[in-house]
Amino acid sequence: MNTIQRRAVMVLATGLLASAAFAQTAPVKVGSKIDTEGKLLGNVIALALEANGIKVENKSALGNTKIMRSAIIVGEIDIYPEYTGNGAFIFGEETNVAWKNAKAGYERVKTLDLAKNKIVWLEPSPANNTWTIAVRKDIATANKLKTLEDLGKWVSGGGQFKLAASAEFVERSDALPAFQTAYGFKLKPEQILTLAGGDTATTIRAAAEKTSGVNAAMAYGTDGPVAALGLVIMEDTKSVQPIYAPAPIVREEVLAKNPKIKTILEPIFKALDGATLQALNAKIQIEGQDAKKVAGDFLKSKGLIK
């Protein structure tokens, strides 16, 4: 081998070593949605990975579902917490009954996302953070409203109703439109206060404080402040909503480079049942604690990080 060949080999070897080093040190980009629980779970993931020696870039509170999906598909983020029931909307399968069953919904979205987008769904939490509507307790009591069927009849009969919600909840076919179809009511534009961001902390507070005449709010099944702020969740007796179990989803190539992500996160999400998420969300929404602090305190209390 002559001098020129040796130099070429050395340059190539140096380049390969540099590429390998970059692959090993490139941070895992952790994202999350902009709502309270999104911020909480995004920080849970970021802190847990970091505590176990995985370098991360925390990009929590990035945006809504559409933004997060686009970001993970193009590689702007590598991992974020998503909900199994959103598979119905993401893959245009709103009529598939699988989404109403926790196990079937998880298996369906896991299969679809891996095949179509090379995105891996890790094991979900046992919680169900389904979309719902919460009404001020004084209104619910006075009008005997316990279910969405009761609410639909009351609204259709001329009940004074105004809902605070995100644009996503109002526009998505599997959210407010699905409730209206199933329970036989139709809100006029003036009966909806659309709030930017999509955080249920904002919609619930708007109902509690009667902002612009609002007396009901878009809420999630694991929202902490619903009862504390004097609202009552309307029961979805027709099971309109899918099961929304939170789970970490990660780009396949990133998981291949960092396989311990799976073993780190699965016991953590298993510990995040509905009651636990409600309590953690309440610390953020009612007590005003920082989402990162709440996430860290939870992980430490469970002995999941030091």
Regions found by a protein language model. Name each.
Residues 19-23:
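Sec/Tat signal peptide C-region and signal peptidase I cleavage site
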